[in-house]
């Protein structure tokens, strides 16, 4: 059996099968990071007036 041809076929099949899952995983990770960023932003909006103190009360 020709090892080079077999290796090329296995490599091609792996690229086809695993190439699509790579993009899906990265998309899920990006969505999770986006959600974390939104939560941090909202929490900082709530905490900032407390940290500023008197200036947040209308002065």
Curated annotation (Swiss-Prot):
It is found in: Secreted. Keywords: Antibiotic, Antimicrobial, Immunity, Innate immunity, Secreted, Signal. Its main location: secreted. Residues 1-23 form the signal peptide. InterPro entries: Cecropin, Cecropin_insect. GO terms for biological process: antibacterial humoral response; defense response to Gram-negative bacterium; defense response to Gram-positive bacterium; innate immune response. GO terms for cellular component: extracellular space. Belongs to the cecropin family. Cecropins have lytic and antibacterial activity against several Gram-positive and Gram-negative bacteria. This is Cecropin-A1. The lineage of its organism: Eukaryota, Metazoa, Ecdysozoa, Arthropoda, Hexapoda.
């Amino acid at each position: 059996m020709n090892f080079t041809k077999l290796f090329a076929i296995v490599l091609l099949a792996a690229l086809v099968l695993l190439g699509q899952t790579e993009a899906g995983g990265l998309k899920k990770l990006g969505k999770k990071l986006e959600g974390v960023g939104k939560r941090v932003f909202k929490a900082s909006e709530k905490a900032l007036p407390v940290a500023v103190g008197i200036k947040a009360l209308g002065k």
